[in-house]
């Protein structure tokens, strides 16, 4: 279920401060964050944000198509190693 429009988008305050500082200083280094729940805002376009997936930080280059989505959608938390082969089918 999507968030109510009257509440507006959610973004962690500390992440917004880091994004504003990076835009003001024209920095290209990745912004490291654990906030997977924060929504991607238009001022983040062009920045690289390292999103934590539970084990490591996954670099995510933000483009225009990602605006309105959550950061966690672009850093997978589970690795699928495939199904085990059926030994009886030989």
UniProtKB/Swiss-Prot annotation:
One of its GO terms (molecular function) is structural constituent of ribosome. GO terms for biological process: ribosomal small subunit assembly; translation. One of its GO terms (cellular component) is cytoplasm. Signal peptide: none annotated. Coiled coil: none annotated. The keyword rRNA-binding applies. This is Small ribosomal subunit protein uS19. It comes from Thioalkalivibrio sulfidiphilus (strain HL-EbGR7).
């Amino acid at each position: 279920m999507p968030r109510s429009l009257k509440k507006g988008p959610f973004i962690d305050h500390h992440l917004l401060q880091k994004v504003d500082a990076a835009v003001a200083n024209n920095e290209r280094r990745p912004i490291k964050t654990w906030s997977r729940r924060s929504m991607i805002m238009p001022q983040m376009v062009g920045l690289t944000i390292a999103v934590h997936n539970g084990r490591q930080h996954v670099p995510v280059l933000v483009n225009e198509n990602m605006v309105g989505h959550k950061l966690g959608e672009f850093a997978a938390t589970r690795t699928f190693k495939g199904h085990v082969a059926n030994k009886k089918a030989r």
